[in-house]
A protein has these predicted regions:
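Short, charged loop segments at secondary-structure junctions
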Residues: 11, 15, 33-50, 59-62, ...
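An acidic, Ser/Thr-enriched
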Residues: 1-42, 64, 202, 221-344
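Ordered, soluble secondary-structure elements with a strong preference for glycine-centered loop motifs
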Residues: 50-55, 314
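A generic structural motif
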Residues: 75, 173-175, 198-201, 208, ...
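Von Willebrand factor A/integrin I-like adhesion domains
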Residues: 162, 178-218, 222, 327, ...
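Short Asp/Glu-rich motifs
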Residues: 84-88, 182, 207, 343
Length: 344
């Protein structure tokens, strides 16, 4: 089943003749020559990273730096309540430098106090990248930032505002059992990066590989989806989850939608790229059939996904609460009371 796309749908009994649908796409994208990197690595070395989180980070960093080639440039910064620029500025990834850096990774400890992320992000953004931006002949200070952290932080709005105007794409990996999930997702989303989370003791190297593949992607692939509602007058969906800003070849994306009419054809994910300012379709993916569910589970899962997006974007909290009540879901907007009646 590897590389296959799937689709499950069912009636939304809470709606008016609507259909809830969940689909998983695994598009095959054309092979392209990878771009060189300008990468700023930012590692959380606050006290909360001690133990398994730091062990995961050491393994991941060694793996990451070994993937760099001599055409790449990079910087490596540790932070906590203070900032430690391991490399004082952006530098080319020559083999001698990488070997010297690798020899220091095992000595990396969670010894820098609290989690002053805002200060560290500002310092990294201000570091001269000294190169040309992707698809641009102009010199720029922008680069990709890879942030590895486990801690919750304060001053979130200022951090997000700084990231948005920095010109950097921020990629985030949250480690441990309680990372600052909403902030890490927003940092990635608002800057065109991506976000992943790894559980305690999970191997982080796969997440690093996916991040590097995205960073090296030389062209932006745009995505569109055809939901195939049966009735012509109901071509548009009532609601659908947001398409990801970027996919890599072989990666699976899960999407949810609520259609105003029944669908008999599986949805199709269309991948396009911009060639000389003209969009050209380069790939598509679709399930071979639709599996039908009549228990109402699909509708509730779609509602949960919609609530998740509303909550993440801090959008319509009243709508999120209304959906949670309507579909009887336990969320941060609702409460569940369990009453146990004892026998007399």
């Amino acid at each position: 089943l590897e590389g296959e796309s799937f689709c499950i749908a069912g009636p939304d009994t809470e709606g008016s003749n609507t259909t809830a649908i969940i689909t998983s796409f695994c598009p095959k994208l054309p092979k392209t020559k990878p771009s060189n990197l300008r990468l700023k690595v930012l590692l959380d070395c606050s006290g909360s990273m001690a133990g398994d989180s730091m062990k995961q980070a050491r393994v991941a960093l060694k793996h990451l730096f070994k993937q760099l080639n001599e055409e790449d440039s990079f910087a490596y910064t540790r932070f906590g309540s203070s900032i430690d620029r391991v490399t004082k500025k952006m530098t080319m990834a020559y083999s001698e430098r990488i070997q010297t850096l690798l020899s220091t990774i095992d000595k990396t400890e969670a010894d820098l106090g609290g989690t002053e992320l805002g200060m560290a992000m500002t310092d990294v953004f201000n570091m001269n990248a000294n190169g040309k931006a992707r698809n641009s002949p102009e010199l720029t200070d922008s680069a990709d930032v890879l942030l590895i952290t486990d801690g919750d932080v304060w001053n979130i709005e200022n951090i997000l505002a700084s990231a948005r105007i920095s010109g950097h794409r921020v990629y985030t990996i949250g480690v441990g059992s309680a990372p600052a999930e909403s902030l890490l997702r927003e940092l990635a989303k608002d800057t065109g990066g991506s976000c992943e989370f790894v559980t305690p003791r999970e191997d982080m190297r796969s997440a690093v590989d996916r991040m590097l593949t995205r960073m090296r992607s030389p062209q932006a692939v745009r995505f569109a989806i055809k939901w195939h509602a049966t009735e012509e007058k109901h071509k548009n969906h009532e609601w659908a989850s947001t398409l990801p800003p970027q996919l890599i070849d072989g990666e699976t994306v899960h999407l949810f939608a609520r259609l105003p009419a029944k669908t008999e054809k599986p949805p199709v994910l269309i991948c396009k790229t911009l060639v000389k300012e003209v969009e050209q379709e380069v790939s598509s993916a679709k399930p071979t059939s639709i599996t039908w569910d009549n228990e109402g589970i699909v509708a509730r899962l779609c509602a949960a996904a919609q609530i998740g997006e509303l909550t993440e974007c801090k959008a319509d909290t009243k709508l999120a609460q209304s959906l949670a009540m309507k579909y009887q879901l336990v969320t941060q907007h609702t409460n569940l009371f369990l009453l146990h009646e004892r026998a007399e």
